[in-house]
Amino acid sequence: MRSCTAAPGVSRTNTHARRGLGVAYRWAVSKTTRAQSGRLSSRFWRLLGATTEKNQNRSLAQVTASAEFDKEAADLNDEKLRKAAGLLNLEDLADSADIPQFLAIAREAGERATGLRPFDVQLLGALRMLAGDVIEMATGEGKTLAGAIAAAGYALGGRHVHVVTINDYLARRDAEWMAPLLEAMDLTVGWITAESTGADRRAAYECDVTYASVNEIGFDVLRDQLVTDVADLVSPNPDVALIDEADSVLVDEALVPLVLAGTTHRETPRLEIIKLVAQLVKDKDADEYFATDADSRNVHLTEAGARKVEKALGGIDLYSEEHVGTTLTEVNVALHAHVLLQRDVHYIVRDDAVHLINASRGRIAQLQRWPDGLQAAVEAKEGIETTETGEVLDTITVQALINRYVTVCGMTGTALAAGEQLRQFYKLGVSPIPPNTPNIREDESDRVYITAAAKNDAIVEHIAEVHDTGQPVLVGTRDVAESEDLHERLLRRDIPAVVLNAKNDAEEAAVIAEAGTLSRVTVSTQMAGRGTDIRLGGSDEADHDQVAELGGLHVVGTGRHHTQRLDNQLRGRAGRQGDPGSSVFFSSWEDDVVAANLDGNKLPMETDEDGQIVSAKAAGLLDHAQRVAEGRMLDVHANTWRYNQLIAQQRAIIVDRRNTLLRTATAREELADLAPKRYKELSETVSEHRLEKICRMIMLYHLDRGWADHLAYLADIRESIHLRALGRQNPLDEFHRMAVDAFASLAADAIEAAQQTFETANVLEDEPGLDLSKLARPTSTWTYMVNDNPLSDDTLSTLSLPGVFR
């Protein structure tokens, strides 16, 4: 973690104290003029509304006005530049007259500190983030610098800013890269990774600007709910969240629960069930025992399969009240593991462990695991020792985590396509930012084939043809298995290709940096979130002109994703900052997005001599399939949000109660009222300070115990709530009713249990106090993310898996 150091001679405290005393260095504001260059096309404004156009025009005018102050900023030495930044009045960003001066200072500080002089479009992007929007900036247009300038604007106004990244690598890289810029404006910078100690984290969060991954921030929030002393709090302050790759964090991973678990003595899932299902699946008559739906996303026992399982388990009735919520659930989970989850598609096996693949990023989800029974079932399927499950002590979804912040803004290359989700679930606007240099990338229409086999043959031929010219090719595949199959095909054609997939993600930055090298062929799984620019001619741009002459980077997509955003992220790798480039997608009527969303009987089948569909409607049909898939994703998000929202509200109540107990004398006062005789007895031998600590530990323990039990109860409900639909009950309504009823007595039960402990705990003989050894907290804790959608694709498709509301 970078230490938080203020600029020499100007302490952080003094800087903020001076901000309300007037602006000694404030320059006169000249009459602003409307910016004429880089105007956005009218179709964006029709989409986003007149209010957005008005706000964007104001920001454009402020960027133009900032040029009037560039010379004054350039004439200031480093010390005066820091002082000028500290004296700006940016507390009310909406009405501040100092915005043009701030932009001039930021531009000058950027050039001095990093060698990067921000373009007008980067300043515009920063202003739209300061207005609370998510901006869409194309790949290579400088989002990192724009984000740092926006963070500086918030911090100079007295706000604490968390720049939220998608992984630790980017958090550290961007913090170290942008720290000189922020420090040049008298701001402190910190960063956090999984290796950061508690002291490192506290120091980083005390900085004006803190860079950290969404996982680490979430885990810090969860761990703070276990401490029994204020001094142990890491205390991330939820003030401003500036989110990089905002669509990935706020949409793709919005529903992912972050989990804090601890050691427990509860039983692990029964291996006999998992082994029984494995035998069932391998049986020569397996087709008689279970059935899958048309798109292989749900599986269930047939009547014959149920009878066979019941017989193997001693003649039980799977659908009886005794077994329907337990044994049947375990059977269904094991079926999903063996029938639907595919190795090298949904997960990989490395170092004797199962690693999930993040579908939206195409990389290993290092901290993710499936809901406990499914994780164990997959491990057993692969012959791997099942990992310790533990007990869930606390959990929070990414969406609930981000909604804690007072202000949320962000940046991504594909915000418009996620605009509806951003508006509906976060009340965020979207501001498209024009490129600094016009995009000249050429995007071909899809090449569509009847079968996947014909498509794959055509892809190899196309890559070979382009490779013969020396033009670099970047191929984006849907999953690991596809990338490795394509790689093998290319090698058989004597085409040397580099593979970047979830199996070698540690090398991804170096691999991607060289994808623009002359004659290079790079095969990669989903490109979202890579965070590394692809420069023509390689990372050193040695052959830039030669590659540009050949047409720049050529991007090949091996199939449409279920959302246009991911297609655009792949296309956006070509045509960086005005460079030439091109893209083409190959699709087939057998692709997932088509099979799940279009009627196969109504698809055109006429082909040319190369097997390519000749109908002009083909690309339009693919677009329609994507729109259907995106609509389903929005419905699923909304439905799942309704389940998670109640838990988030209940958690907020617990957090508020816990903070009261932790930071005040409430625990001592309440137990004194509830057990006055015991309190009087103890107060005669125990100091008030120690007695307060004892009372706090007792009350916190029972509150935490009650919350963990409540979460376990909710998990049990989720495993069988879908069965309520069979009785014509609304599962959501039933879940809410049961969750509310259970929560109603949680606080009172915790207080009652605390009173009993206070009155019955033995008095210590060797020192004043109570023996609290029975209030045993977990001997170890760990954090992870739950992949609550095991067949994760970009639609979050409906599943029958118990415990998943889809």
Swiss-Prot record:
Similarity comment text for this entry: Belongs to the SecA family.
Name assigned to this protein: Protein translocase subunit SecA 2
CDD domains, per the entry: DEXDc_SecA, SF2_C_secA
Biological function: Part of the Sec protein translocase complex. Interacts with the SecYEG preprotein conducting channel. Has a central role in coupling the hydrolysis of ATP to the transfer of proteins into and across the cell membrane, serving as an ATP-driven molecular motor driving the stepwise translocation of polypeptide chains across the membrane.
Places the protein is found: Cell membrane; Cytoplasm
SUPFAM superfamilies per the UniProt record, alphabetical: Helical scaffold and wing domains of SecA, P-loop containing nucleoside triphosphate hydrolases, Pre-protein crosslinking domain of SecA
GO cellular component, one term: cytosol
Upper lineage: Bacteria, Bacillati, Actinomycetota, Actinomycetes, Mycobacteriales
UniProt xrefs under PROSITE patterns: SECA (PS01312), SECA_MOTOR_DEAD (PS51196)
Gene Ontology terms, MF aspect: ATP binding; protein-exporting ATPase activity
